[in-house]
Amino acid sequence: MSVGIVGGGLLGLGIANHLASAGVEVELYEADKRLGGLAGSTRIGGVAVDRYYHCVTTTDHKVVSLAESLGLSIRWRPLGVGFFHDGRRCSMSTPLEVLKFPGLRIDDKARLAAFVLACGRISDHEPLDELGIEEWARRKSGNRLWERLWAPLLDSKFDGRYDDLPATYLWSRMRRTAGTRDRKGREVMGAIEGGYQALVDRLAERIRAMGGRIHVNAPVRHIPASASGRALGVVTEGGLREHDVVVTTQLRPNLRGILDASFEEALGEDPLRYMGIVCLVARVKRSVSPYYAINITDRRVPITSVVETTHVVDPAWVDGHLIYVPKYVQSTSPDLARSSEDITEEFLGHVKALFPDFRRDDVIASQVARARVAEPVHVARVENRIPPVFAAPGLAVASSARVHPNIVHGQAIAGVAEHVAGEVIDRLPTFTSQRSAA
């Protein structure tokens, strides 16, 4: 019984780990020279760092358990969270600081607290999928909270287009952050020593030790279908490699041209849209921000946030301090094609606007990372939001789009990997017998 997995990010490796642990013959194909995908690393001034910012929360039980089973330690720290609102910087790290937030009246703050508590009491997300985010947020938390808080935050996260989002998105974010606070109300987050790349590398070692085969620099060119409509395997530069089941882990736009036309037809129209990201990562000599992350509701600063991960990551691990300046963009944004020099100059200017003590000569080294298709966006009122795992006999389609109703994070990806692997194990004997009969 052989399974081919297309994609060597956390999802593909997670599926491979579950399958190999169950005794399934696994072969994984990664187009890049390194495993990890969006969770992979890069080198900034000779030091390995996460390409994009990642953290672990106290509720990420699957990630914590996996890291510990691989012998990796996690460094936990209480964190500060800031806001940049109407040209002013303020802390929103504890409930008391929320009460002092200058952009809202006391009745707004009471409604905000009630809204967060209400989100925690809602367990069924399906009715929220049918409600627009603005309609629901205005009704539940009031017009002023929508206009002063939610709308500007969504604008920065979704590059101005959030009118089609379901209420589920805001509900999910509130539930994730509410369960990660200490007794003082501060968010607690963790960093894996060595970054997510260490998790990726150790996971790959485990898969190989169980007999799994992993190929890097091995882009899959095509997934062909038999005359009966069954997936035959994968076509790489070396030709066709047959498998009983093929599992893809890419988002739909990244599968175009790879799937047989019959598989594309079986999948039907994609109900999702996708966000890209442009992210400046810089190693700096000293701390830039008193916060782990700053939320920006003043849209005169057109970035999503400034994240100083060395409030969690030990500065000794990266020989300095580390800031990420992300901007989520539409997949057609011209920012995706701008030069790294232009992006660096502009984004560092925004950092200076938020933190006037920041000096350009504090930057040791920097790099701009981009991804045209980085995150799926689920919209309100659609059918077949999450299709069956198997799109056709022998073809399982998995991606980060399956995390819904959660937002995309390591814990949710680990859950998808476990679910998809379970489906493959349940149906693999059927596809194996079909292949033998053919």
Spans of model-derived segments:
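N-terminal Rossmann-like FAD-binding beta1-loop-alpha1 element of flavoenzymes
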Residues: 2-28
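Conserved Rossmann-like nucleotide-cofactor binding loop
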Residues: 11, 34, 253
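Dinucleotide-binding Rossmann-like beta1-alpha1 core, especially the glycine-rich loop
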Residues: 45-127
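Active-site/ligand-binding neighborhood in enzyme catalytic cores
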Residues: 104, 113-223, 232, 249
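Internal hydrophobic alpha-helix adjacent to the cofactor/substrate pocket in enzyme cavities
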Residues: 413-432
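Short FAD-binding loop at a beta-strand-to-alpha-helix junction that anchors the flavin cofactor
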Residues: 322-324, 387-406, 412, 416
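Glycine-rich FAD pyrophosphate-binding loop
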Residues: 20-44
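Mid-domain catalytic core of redox enzymes
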Residues: 22, 219-337, 341, 345-358, ...
